[in-house]
Design a protein with these regions (language model features):
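Boundary/entry segment of secreted carbohydrate-active catalytic domains
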Residues: 5-80
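Beta-sheet entry/capping signal
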Residues: 12-14, 73-75, 113-115, 196-201
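Active-site beta-loop-alpha junctions enriched in small/polar residues
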Residues: 19-23, 81-83, 119-123, 202-207
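Serine/threonine-rich low-complexity intrinsically disordered regions
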Residues: 27, 32, 37, 51-52, ...
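Short acidic/His/Gly/Ser-rich catalytic and metal-binding motifs that mark active-site loops
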Residues: 27, 125-128, 209-212
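Aromatic-lined substrate-binding rim segments of carbohydrate-active enzymes
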Residues: 49-159, 167-190
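Polysaccharide-binding and catalytic clefts of secreted carbohydrate-active enzymes
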Residues: 136-270
Length: 270
């Protein structure tokens, strides 16, 4: 009887969160017919300290009139490109507080659930800092032929950043610094605004490893799938040493005989 009287546990609503482009495009700029390029539109909105909250509300209200309610709710995914946050100053590259503030203010003004996508992968290629990062080979991955892949995605630039996690590598240092900064800003939001953020995602994709990605979506052979930069290969060997302890143990467990760790090749088979 007691079990029958116990209320079932409440279930969190199912959130539909489509990625919405142009979140920082404000209504005022779209009404200015002299602004033809997106970067000009965004600069105008930033100067006004405006964003696309009003347009976002209108869009989501067409999908779920009356606001989010019930067991299935419509929200959105907001993408924040971490490297794109940086601006150059006489003291070097610093995070532009205004860019982060604009997105967080949009989240505060739109009473909808949101997934915050902190993007720092190969599609984070449009920021001013990228031109400097390109000059340092340490920031790039390499394929087995010793060269970084050179691909685009339907006109959008793709940059093959290293797969290493070494925080001293410049691209990683900037990415990690931006990640920590955004985390601090989110933590400082009012609780009601924080609770609108139903999830964080760092989702990455492997487009930059696909041969002829735009045309080769169905390819399953000759796929190049890892980072053969010498430093990455050295990381692989150090991992083997931690995992097996000695080359003798490696041979006992795998049947592979090498005189030392430096002789172990990185995986190279399809």
């Amino acid at each position: 009887l007691a079990m029958a009287q116990t209320a079932p546990p409440s279930r969190a609503p199912f959130i539909i969160a489509p990625t919405v482009e142009g979140l920082m495009v404000c209504d005022e700029a779209t009404q200015n017919l002299a602004l033809l390029a997106l970067d000009k539109v965004l600069a105008d909105c930033q100067a006004r300290k405006a964003h696309g909250a009003a347009a976002l509300k209108r869009l989501l209200d067409t999908l779920e009139p009356g606001g989010p309610k019930g067991q299935v709710q419509v929200g959105y995914t907001a993408t924040l490109e971490l490297l794109k946050l940086y601006r150059h100053t006489p003291k070097g590259w610093v995070i532009d507080d205004a860019k982060v503030s604009a997105l967080l203010d949009l989240i505060a003004q739109v009473p909808r659930p949101v997934v915050l996508y902190l993007s720092a992968g190969h599609f984070d290629s449009q920021g001013a800092i990228v031109a400097e990062l390109e000059k340092d080979p340490a920031n790039w991955m390499q394929l087995a032929d010793g060269k970084p892949p050179a691909l685009g995605y339907f006109g959008y630039r793709i940059l093959p950043y290293t797969l290493r996690t070494d925080a001293s590598i410049p691209v990683n240092r900037y990415r990690f610094e931006a990640l920590r900064y955004v985390a601090r800003r989110v933590k400082a939001l009012p609780k009601a605004v924080q609770e609108r953020i139903v999830a964080f995602t760092l989702a990455g994709e492997l487009h930059h490893l696909f041969p002829d990605f735009e045309n080769g979506m169905g390819a399953f052979q000759n796929i190049r799938v890892t980072d053969y930069h010498p430093a990455s290969v050295a990381d692989f060997r150090r991992w083997l040493a931690r995992e097996y302890g000695s080359v003798q143990t490696l041979q006992e467990r795998t049947g592979l005989a090498y005189p030392d760790w430096d002789s172990v090749p990185a995986p190279a088979k399809d």
